Amino acid sequence: MTRMYGGDVIDLGKGGEYGMVNPLEIIMDADENEIKTGLGYTVLNKTLQSLKAFMKYYAPDIEDDVLTLFSEVVQDTYARFGITFTSDFTQFTSNQFPTFSDVYVTVTSKLTSMTEKTHERDVMERLELKLRPFVRELQYYFNGHTSINTDSDFLVFNIKELMNSDANIRNALLFNVLKFAWGLCLNPNKNTVLSVDEAHVLLGAKNELGAEFLAQVQRRARKYNTGTIIITQQPSDFVADGILMHGKAIFDNSSYYLVMGLKKQAVEDLSMLIDLNDNEKEGIKRFSQGEALFVCGNRRMQINVIVTEDELESFGSGGGL
């Protein structure tokens, strides 16, 4: 479908030779009020928060002290590259940001200087173990400068190759791609649309930082003339403990909903996010292919989605028809 409409597919799930997104590259996400508090501070602080969310996807069991030290080590690494809370990030290019190799050097250098067996050294050793795969077996996914051509008006980031692989790696890669894609939508003078398929994957990891990031994207999109399309088959992941507040924010900041057929429990979960009466709940459980509940403001109607021959052709063999 992408190529039929003149777009580009980027197979990030296949590794660096197909395109790399550097998790340490900083995106310029700040509005006018935030700029008043100091652009560098706002942008770098958000970057550090998103990097901690990234690490939580990659290593859900990471201890709080290790995560805190990771943030400090990243700040030290940024400082070596002239990146501080007072930097003008509009002047940086992709090749000027550090990579995980540079973060790993910071960690190993600090370990070398720690001759005593202390708690700080223990935490640093645990951090080194978490980071080591980034410069070894996972380097083709996460270690390198961003190398993606973003000139196309229609970009699809494909991670299909990883959907059946280790869940933590997949989730970290998906979050990294989402953060990068959001960075492409931050020019208020250009209309853009950010579509996130399989959004439940991000929330299914019960990563509150990641859920908060997606909720912030949904809230802030209109400031940048960006439309968002959030697609999920599992509303249950939006109502999990610790996630519900962000799940509701994602739905509350939507202009309309298109609800297709769902099973009983999924309908009950969805009703925690949007108002559904009993008739609508029963209808959703019985919907067949193409039937949907369309909600736009106060208007609610059952519709039938009729696909055209051109649309069928664009789906290829992956349309499920």
Segments and roles (model prediction):
Residues 1-8, 12-15, 22-226, 230, ...:
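P-loop NTPase motor domains
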Residues 14-17, 262-264:
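Short, acidic/turn-prone active-site loops that include or flank metal/cofactor-
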Residues 18, 37, 315-319:
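Feature targets compositionally biased, intrinsically disordered low-complexity regions
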Residues 233-236:
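C-terminal amphipathic alpha-helical interaction region
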Residues 238-321:
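C-terminal regions of RecA-like/P-loop NTPase motor modules
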